[in-house]
C-alpha cells in the first residue's frame, strides 16, 4: 500500500464523525462512578517479559492529521489528566505520530518520571494524500525520542496494518525495528491491526511481540465478529504475543453505562487480552474506568 485517503483510513480505523458525535452526546455527559481510591494493577504482557498496567491512557481518540481529542484539551489539561491517571496506577501512555500528542506525552513523562512509565507509540509507514509521507525509520525514531523526551521506547508498532500482506510490504521497516530493538532503542515491536487478515497473520508471525487489536462484545468498529476476533487473539496469546485491546467502547458506539460495563467484562473475562488502551479526556472518565476495571478484575 502506497497511499490511503482520509475516507479509506476512517473506514479502516473508525475515527469517524459518527463516533465523535456519539461520545460528544453520550460518554462525556454520563454520570460516572466516584473514585474509591482503587489502583490499576499490573499484568504480564504475553511472554515479552514486560509487566504493564492493565489500562493505558490513550491519546488518539479521533486522531487524524496530527490532532486528536486529547490534543484538543490542551497541554496543561492533558498533563493534569496524565498525572491523575498516573497517581491511580495508569502508568502506561499510548500514543502515535499521527495523533500529534508526542510532545504532550513528553511533558507528562517529564513530570512523573520517564522510568516510571511504559510508553507505546506507533509509526505510519505509508502515505496519506498530500499531508503525510513516511520519513526514513532513523529520522522518525530520532524525532519521536526528541518529542517525548526519552532515549528509548518501550513498545513501537507499525500503525494501522490493513491487509495480510504487511510482512512483505513493510519488511524493510520490520528489519529497522529489529535492529533498533537489538540496540535497546525499542524494547518490544509489533503492529496495530485494522483488518482481520492482518490480525490472523500477526497471530502467527514470529516478528511481532505485541498486537494492538480492536475488541468489544458488540463488534462495533471491529475487524470481524467478536467470536472470530477473540479466536485469533487466543491463538496469538497461545503463541506468546502480548495482546492490547482497543476500541473497547466501540469508538463512541458503546457509551451507555451497561454497554461500557458489558464490554469491559467481555474483554477482561476472556483471558485473551492482557491489557487495554482507552482514550479518556477527563478525570471523571479516568476514575470511572478504573473503578469498573478493578471490580471486574477482582471478582
Please place each PLM-identified region on the residue numbering.
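Short, acidic/polar
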Residues: 70-84, 133-147, 194-201, 259-266
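Active-site mouth loops of central-metabolism enzymes
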Residues: 61-75, 123-135, 254-256
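Acidic (Asp/Glu)-rich catalytic clusters
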Residues: 47-49, 106-114, 145-149, 203-206, ...
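Active-site groove signature of glycoside hydrolases
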Residues: 148-164
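N-terminal binding-site loop/beta-alpha segment at the start of enzyme catalytic domains
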Residues: 2-117, 266, 270
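Alpha-helical scaffolding within the catalytic cores
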Residues: 38-43, 102-104, 137-144, 195-199, ...
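Beta/alpha (TIM)-barrel catalytic core signal, keyed to glycine-rich beta->alpha loops juxtaposed to Asp/Glu
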Residues: 161-299
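A short, structured active-site edge motif that brings together acidic residues
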Residues: 116-129, 159
Amino acid at each position: 500500500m502506497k497511499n490511503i485517503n482520509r475516507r479509506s483510513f476512517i473506514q479502516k480505523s473508525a475515527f469517524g464523525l459518527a463516533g465523535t458525535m456519539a461520545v460528544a452526546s453520550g460518554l462525556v455527559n454520563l454520570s460516572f462512578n466516584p473514585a474509591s481510591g482503587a489502583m490499576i494493577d499490573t499484568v504480564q504482557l504475553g511472554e515479552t517479559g514486560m509487566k504493564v498496567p492493565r489500562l493505558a491512557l490513550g491519546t488518539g481518540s479521533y486522531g487524524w492529521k496530527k490532532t486528536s481529542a486529547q490534543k484538543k484539551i490542551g497541554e496543561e489539561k492533558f498533563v493534569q489528566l496524565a498525572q491523575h491517571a498516573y497517581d491511580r496506577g495508569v502508568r502506561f501512555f499510548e500514543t502515535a505520530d499521527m495523533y500529534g500528542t508526542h510532545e504532550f506525552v513528553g511533558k507528562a513523562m517529564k513530570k512523573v518520571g520517564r522510568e516510571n512509565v511504559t510508553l507505546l507509540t506507533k509509526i505510519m509507514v505509508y502515505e496519506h494524500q498530500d499531508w503525510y509521507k513516511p520519513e526514513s525509520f532513523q529520522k522518525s525514531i530520532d524525532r519521536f525520542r526528541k518529542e517525548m523526551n526519552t532515549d528509548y521506547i518501550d513498545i513501537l508498532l507499525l500503525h494501522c496494518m490493513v491487509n495480510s500482506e504487511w510482512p512483505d510490504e513493510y519488511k524493510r521497516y520490520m528489519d529497522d525495528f529489529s535492529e533498533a530493538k537489538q540496540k535497546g532503542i525499542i524494547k518490544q515491536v509489533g503492529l496495530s491491526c485494522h483488518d482481520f487478515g492482518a490480525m490472523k497473520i500477526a497471530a502467527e508471525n514470529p516478528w511481532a511481540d505485541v498486537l494492538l487489536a480492536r475488541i468489544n462484545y458488540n463488534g462495533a468498529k471491529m475487524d470481524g465478529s467478536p467470536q472470530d476476533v477473540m479466536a485469533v487473539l487466543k491463538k496469538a496469546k497461545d503463541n506468546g504475543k502480548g495482546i492490547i485491546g482497543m476500541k473497547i467502547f466501540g469508538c463512541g458506539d458503546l457509551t451507555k453505562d451497561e454497554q461500557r460495563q458489558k464490554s469491559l467484562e467481555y474483554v477482561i473475562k476472556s483471558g485473551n487480552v492482557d491489557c487495554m488502551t482507552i482514550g479518556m479526556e477527563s478525570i471523571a472518565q479516568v476514575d470511572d474506568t478504573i473503578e469498573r476495571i478493578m471490580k471486574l478484575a477482582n471478582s
